[in-house]
């Protein structure tokens, strides 16, 4: 079976078994967590600038804690801009946000991440999902 194949090919790997829904949820949740982390550190960067502090000094001190992984703490990001860009983070934050709304579950944190990101970037990568109801397409 498939599990035996992966065990044979990757004997040292930890293999997790889950449903496709659980797997897709994990991928989306991780990307949304990283997007929130990027947004949080960008806001700390702006605060440091307003206080006349060196963000990188403070970030490096924070990272000595070892509870905070340094990934996604560089500001500006790899594209030289504030907040998150690329394809996956904007797509996944919007998709999960819309899904949370349809499920009528709490979504204020993710909503704030998306809203604040959109204030920092005007690049239209954070796709707005619009209802096509009553519209001619």
Tell where the protein language model's regions lie, with residue ranges.
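Internal alpha-helical scaffold of NAD(P)-dependent oxidoreductase catalytic cores
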Residues: 1-71, 99-103
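NAD(P)-dependent Rossmann-like dehydrogenase/reductase catalytic/cofactor-binding core
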Residues: 4, 49-137
């Amino acid at each position: 079976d498939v599990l035996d194949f992966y065990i044979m090919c990757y004997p040292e790997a930890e293999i997790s078994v889950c449903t496709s829904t659980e797997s897709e949820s994990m991928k989306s949740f991780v990307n949304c967590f990283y997007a929130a982390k990027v947004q949080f550190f960008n806001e700390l960067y702006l605060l440091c600038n307003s206080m006349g502090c060196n963000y990188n000094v403070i970030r490096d001190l924070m990272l000595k804690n070892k509870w905070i992984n340094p990934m996604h703490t560089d500001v500006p990001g790899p594209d030289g801009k504030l907040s998150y860009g690329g394809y996956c983070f904007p797509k996944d934050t919007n998709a999960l946000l819309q899904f949370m709304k349809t499920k009528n579950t709490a979504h204020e944190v993710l909503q704030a991440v998306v809203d604040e990101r959109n204030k920092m970037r005007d690049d239209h990568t954070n796709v707005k999902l619009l209802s096509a109801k009553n519209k001619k397409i």
